Amino acid sequence: MTMTLHTKASGMALLHQIQGNELEPLSRPQLKMPLERALSEVYVDSSKPAMFNYPEGAAYEFNAATAPAPVYGQTGIAYGSGSEATAFGSNSLGLFPQLNSVSPSPLMLLHPPPPQLSPFLHPHGQQVPYYLENEPSAYAVRDSGPPAFYRSNSDNRRQSGRERLSSSSEKGSMAMESVKETRYCAVCNDYASGYHYGVWSCEGCKAFFKRSIQGHNDYMCPATNQCTIDKNRRKSCQACRLRKCYEVGMMKGGIRKDRRGGRMLKHKRQRDDLEGRNDMGPSGDMRATNLWPSPLVIKHTKKNSPALSLTADQMVSALLDAEPPLIYSEYDPSRPFSEASMMGLLTNLADRELVHMINWAKRVPGFGDLNLHDQVHLLECAWLEILMIGLIWRSMEHPGKLLFAPNLLLDRNQGKCVEGMVEIFDMLLATSARFRMMDLQGEEFVCLKSIILLNSGVYTFLSSTLKSLEEKDHIHRVLDKITDTLIHLMAKAGLTLQQQHRRLAQLLLILSHIRHMSNKGMEHLYNMKCKNVVPFYDLLLEMLDAHRLHTPVSRMGVSPEEPSQSQLTTTNSTSSHSLQTYYIPSEAESFPNTI
């Protein structure tokens, strides 16, 4: 039996409107819903309200006299929770629910991509209209229920997050690139590829220096040893290029401290952890550490060093036996002195004395127990001080004169022929007079000379680019041994305790003046080298350049750019020797070749 609805005309009109908007009806599976009342009670007259019980048990009222709020918008259809019409579906006839059909779960929601809906709060049982703003129609199926009124697209959020991340990473990479500093080769001013042999250099200069120190290449400059070395002319002269490498500080052992191998870093971390655990007491508190470490906890100490077991008399005897022989100069009395001739005599004499100094240092008790790096480091720092204290000692018996060699005795007036030499002469003469007044003994002299050697490089400058000493503890113990020997000599001479303290302080204070004279002399020698007044021999040149690496640039009287502009002439003399040749032959490969 078919019932005729009173609102059929209005339902047909609404159906034509939907078809005009080209909206396809939703197809849903038909679910059987048991009705609690007869059909006649469901379809009621439009003049009175109708009641219908849904499965949720909620009662809904529809007033046909009042124009119902449209569920369908102009541009789309939306079904959402809280809407009575959308909770159970609508048929093509309008607002009345379709018989024996409910909305399945999950619910289906048709909405624009940005669902800009305008919900209105309402009391329970009242229909809620949804006004879709003027947005293009789109459809999306939502699997979760119940659907929310507004839910942003998670794909859009993820995409925007990826865009923000990529943009931030691009900004970060640009910032890192801006922070990176462009470095140039210290030899030829080309772009540097890294930190090689102690300086920033390019691949070409790195490979050239590597070939030069591995092979025995005797480069000869075809001109005057003044060739310009830059990016375009670095291959024109190998001799000047190698000279430039040494001037800027390239050396065979020059490596960055952070470039050590992973195994070395692992062992260092393990050693540091072990030391940290040893420093912790039983209760977890740090043990109190003394300013001067105890001999029982000193690390890297040569416990079996013969020097530490020597008596004071044995130490003095060993130091006296290690003294180098006297060296005669090439002075010709028939030739008058000039700036070039005097500097030539002094540099030649100093170059030959350096060879004997190396042999003397190896015979100083405790010095031979150090590793090769520390031995070279101490000699490079103290070589001019050792030469000066020897000159002062020889000149004690010649007031007003300096005995450079048995056949070369110079006074202050003769030193005036060399620019800047008079000031150094005066300081040397004053120190010699001080030694003469104190009646310095030969045993005290050899002790002071050894103290200068061992104490020169213990406290390096912070601005030094070279590695500091590795066995400082052993050096300190040998210094203490020699100082005790010096005190023993004073006590043996019959001085009282107060006189011993006073004399020891006076002698050690003189060492600071010798250090000052050494710095003045180093500055003078470097100026002579830059002016090309006299040719410098290989070993002397190597020691001069090495001393400048241990000294801050501000200490020297020249700017750091001068080494690259200096005019240097080297003499390949048979009497000149390199430190690598005469120091320790078995480990000579650890030193770079000189020019």
From Swiss-Prot:
Q: Enumerate the residue ranges of region (Hinge).
A: 251-310
Q: Which SMART domains match?
A: HOLI, ZnF_C4
Instruction: Enumerate the subcellular locations listed in this protein's record, separating them with semicolons.
Output: Nucleus; Cytoplasm; Golgi apparatus; Cell membrane
Keyword Ubl conjugation attached: yes
Quote the PROSITE patterns the UniProt record gives.
NR_LBD, NUCLEAR_REC_DBD_1, NUCLEAR_REC_DBD_2
Positions of region (Transactivation AF-2): 311-595
Renumbered to this chain, region (Interaction with AKAP13) spans 262-595
List, as start-end ranges, the regions of compositional bias called Low complexity: 564-578
| Spans annotated as Self-association | 264-595
* Disordered: annotated segments: 143-174, 260-285, 554-578
**Where do the record's region annotations for Required for interaction with NCOA1 lie?**
35-47
What does its PTM field state?
A: Ubiquitinated; regulated by LATS1 via DCAF1 it leads to ESR1 proteasomal degradation. Deubiquitinated by OTUB1. Ubiquitinated by STUB1/CHIP; in the CA1 hippocampal region following loss of endogenous circulating estradiol (17-beta-estradiol/E2). Ubiquitinated by UBR5, leading to its degradation: UBR5 specifically recognizes and binds ligand-bound ESR1 when it is not associated with coactivators (NCOAs). In presence of NCOAs, the UBR5-degron is not accessible, preventing its ubiquitination and degradation.
- Chain intervals for the UniProt region annotation (Modulating(transactivation AF-1)): 1-184
Cite the InterPro entries for this sequence.
Est_rcpt/est-rel_rcp, Estr_rcpt, Estr_rcpt_N, NHR-like_dom_sf, Nucl_hrmn_rcpt_lig-bd, Nuclear_hormone_rcpt_NR3, Nuclear_hrmn_rcpt, Oestrogen-typ_rcpt_final_C_dom
For the modification Phosphotyrosine, the affected residues are: 537
Interaction with DDX5: annotated segments: 35-174
Asymmetric dimethylarginine PTM sites in chain numbering? 260
Q: Which PANTHER family match?
A: KNIRPS-RELATED PROTEIN-RELATED
Q: What name does UniProt use for this protein?
A: Estrogen receptor
